């Protein structure tokens, strides 16, 4: 089964992120949840983003790369919200990842390298009415998602009919158990 590095969102390594990791692990996988904030968590996304800006996104990226180096056995990298950035970066610049899972966020295919790694599966989960996704992530992901007309595109994009950014985190008001169950099932299918 897969070894996965899962990066948390802007609120930090919340109990809800840990719970999601346990749900993913229930498929027989090992999920590592590095703490990019050194134990700090935040009540609102705005507070968490302010902390991330204080640390600097380059520093968050470096911490993510160090976490990947600590878990060299991992073959899958994943991120939620802000955590998509270090996951995406690792998938593009560290050889050996067979999959990248992006939840509540997406980046340009060439964000950290000229081309997406052809051997790295890309699975994206976004809310269709999520204000954060509507700032560009959803449109960006749709531009390279596989469709009936373009089956050769690199990403599998799953769109959820919700305005909740962190619907997969049970410790937030955004949590939706039904959508989370669908998301986890799709991740298990990818990793099977």
Where are the language model's segments positioned?
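Conserved alpha/beta-hydrolase "acid-adjacent" motif
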Residues: 131-140
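Short beta-strand immediately N-terminal to the catalytic nucleophile in serine-hydrolase-like folds
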Residues: 77-79, 103
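Conserved strand-to-loop "acid loop" that flanks and positions the catalytic carboxylate
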Residues: 9, 123-132
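Gly/Ala-rich beta-loop-alpha elbow adjacent to hydrolase catalytic centers
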Residues: 79-87
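A conserved short beta-strand
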Residues: 96-107
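Serine-hydrolase catalytic machinery in alpha/beta-hydrolase-like enzymes
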Residues: 1-72, 167-171
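Short beta-strand/loop motif that positions the catalytic acidic residue
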Residues: 118, 124-126, 160
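C-terminal catalytic histidine-bearing segment of alpha/beta-hydrolase fold enzymes
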Residues: 151-192
């Amino acid at each position: 089964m897969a070894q996965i590095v899962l990066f948390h969102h802007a609120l930090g390594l919340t109990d809800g992120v840990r719970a999601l990791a346990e749900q993913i692990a229930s498929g027989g996988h090992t999920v590592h949840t590095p703490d990019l904030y050194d134990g700090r968590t935040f009540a609102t996304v705005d507070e968490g983003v302010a902390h991330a800006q204080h640390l600097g996104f380059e520093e968050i990226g470096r911490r993510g790369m160090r976490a990947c180096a600590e878990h060299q056995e991992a073959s899958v990298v994943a991120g939620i919200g802000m955590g998509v950035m270090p996951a995406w970066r690792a998938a593009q610049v560290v050889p050996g990842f067979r999959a990248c899972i992006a939840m509540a966020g997406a980046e340009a295919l060439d964000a950290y390298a000229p081309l997406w790694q052809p051997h790295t599966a890309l699975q994206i989960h976004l809310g269709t009415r999520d204000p954060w996704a509507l700032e560009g992530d959803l449109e960006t992901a749709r531009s390279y998602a596989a469709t009936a007309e373009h089956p050769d595109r690199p990403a599998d994009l799953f769109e959820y009919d919700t305005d909740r950014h962190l619907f997969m985190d049970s410790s937030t008001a955004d949590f939706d158990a039904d959508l989370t169950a669908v998301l986890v099932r799709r991740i298990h299918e990818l990793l099977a």
